[in-house]
Amino acid sequence: MEAGIGRGILYDREDVRDSEDVYAAYASMPVFLDREASHRYQLFCVRDDSMTDGTRDSLCIGDILLCREVFREDWTHGLIGRYPNVVVVTEEGILLRRLTKHDRKQETISLHSLNRGDEDRIIALQDVKAFFYVERLIERHLSQW
C-alpha cells in the first residue's frame, strides 16, 4: 500500500478545497501493513508541539503518522474507538489532537492537546471536512528525544 503526505496546519497551508486533488498532489511512500487495507490512508507530518508533553505518548515535530480516514457516513456510529489520537481537517486547517468525547446528540467532538499550553477544543461535526484515526507512528528522528 502507498500513503501520501497531505498539507494543512500540521504543515504548510493549502487552499485547495477538493480533498481528492489535495491527496493526489503530494508525494507518497510505501507503508507495510499486517492486514489488507480497504480504507483510504494518509501520512501526516507533525509540525507543531500540540501533542508533546514529555511522555512516551508524545507525537513530536517531524514525526510521520499513518492515519486512516473515517468516512462521514460512519461518524454517526461513534468516533471514540481504539485509536485515541486523531487528525481533524476543518476550513481553518488540520488539527492533531486526542479525541476525548463524541457527543452524538450535539454532533460535536471534544479534542485535547497533550501540551498544557494549548487549549482543548470542541468542534461541530458540520465544520469537519475529514476525520482520521492515527494508527501508527511511521517515522521519528531520534534527535526529538
Report the location of each language-model feature.
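Short beta-strand-centered aromatic/proline hotspots
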Residues: 95-101
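Residue-level recognition of conserved beta-strand edge/terminus positions
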Residues: 67-68, 89
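Short, positionally conserved secondary-structure boundary motifs
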Residues: 1-61, 71-75, 140-145
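Structural motif
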Residues: 60-64, 84
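Short, compositionally biased
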Residues: 76-94
